[in-house]
Amino acid sequence: MKTQATLLLALLIGIPVIAQEDHSEFIEGPFASPQEVTETCLLCHDGVDRDIMQTRHWNWLGNEFVNSEGEKMMVGKQNLINNYCISLNSNWSRCTSCHIGFGWKDDTFDFENPNNIDCLICHDRSGSYKKSPTGAGMPDPSVDLVKVAKSVGKTTNRSCADCHFNGGGGSGVKHGDLTASMLNPSPALDFHMGKLGFTCSDCHAGENHQILGAGHGSLAAGTNHMSCLDCHGEEPHRKKVINDHVNAVACETCHIPTFAREEPTMTWWDWSTAGQDKTVPLDEYGKPLYDKKKGDFLWEKNVVPVYKWHNGQADSYQPGEKFNPEQALELNRPGGTMFDESSKITPFKLMRSKQIYDPKNNYLILPKLFGKDGYWTTFDWNEASKIGMAVNELDYSGEYDFVYSRMYWPINHMVAPAKSSLKCADCHSQKESKRLNWEALGYKGDPMKVGGRAK
């Protein structure tokens, strides 16, 4: 390949290719496939493929841990269930449009082939690179691979936004604190990014492509955390009385008083109403309230978080795990209590849903949604359940119903300016606090009156 010859020549005559930020003089193409782009990248970036293959972004799994049954486990997007589009397995080609690889269309994907790594999805600086929404991670056919490869450099906010701002199928669907409004936020929306010019990588960059930050897979293992205190220290305030809260209250609790402040976020998804031919007007924010493929939705803006004690860990519902359908199923359960000194009162987005389950086996159904035989094409829940459960190697009784579920999503972004943070009276006042339910948190009343965990 012409490009390979150019790069090899550069290496032989001592040009510092790796340190060279402008790649345009080394990249020539043409490229018959995106894998050829990766092959070219690895000619100089030797060993990077081995690093990437150890990451959560590549494997969609967190660290190994031992569960309450004494079993070793690794969990992540590969095997966790949510109450949005439910499950990866049998729906690969749609879900893996956000994978940092090429061609993960079924369970035969080769995680050991370095040429399957997509360097461009994170390092494109042309602004023109995009994945095909249903192409199993392959680039959209319109992408000019040579142009994009010549542009590569350090990651940008858009690098992260393309996937993380659009989780669940669109901006604000999954994350209430990560939406399109965060691409160029005002200081009022996010002080660090809007006022100080922070990028995602300023906080999240780790070593060897190990991006910092605990998603659901990391929460299960209790690893890969980062904290405001990493930069601000244990006594970030001038007043001691406020610093006394740091050991029991997460920084985000006061400094992110609400989320989805400029763009709404989805808070309810009812799969049981899907399949109907009806027209429902858009809501006050211009968001859909109904989709035949997916059912009814509810969107909210300027949302007050739900607060729970959290110690950095969480238990998650596992495929095939039985539950009581008379109660709302919690798909993840943030760990921590008032009596656990590693726990802090922490803000979450609560996502509520009504999703499909097997009433005879009393566990969730993982339906096939995408593809010619998926529910989004056939509108046949029974067939979609049969196919999806077979792929997941779980028994399907032939009966289905719908159950209420809840899922907690940590709130870490949209840090407001200090003047907009919560004040003492927002939580402690003569009247009953409308923000914090002290009894639900384990207190007998307002801890300012009855005592708490402050130093």
Language-model region placement:
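Positively charged n-region of N-terminal signal peptides that target proteins for export
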Residues: M1-A5
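Long, compositionally biased charged/polar accessory segments in the mid-to-C-terminal portions
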Residues: L289-P334, M338-T346, M351-Q355, P367-M389, ...
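Short, well-structured alpha-helical interface segments that form or flank functional binding sites
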Residues: V246-V249, S343, K419-L422
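Sequence context of c-type cytochrome heme-c attachment sites
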Residues: A19-T156, D162-H225, L229-N243, I345-R352, ...
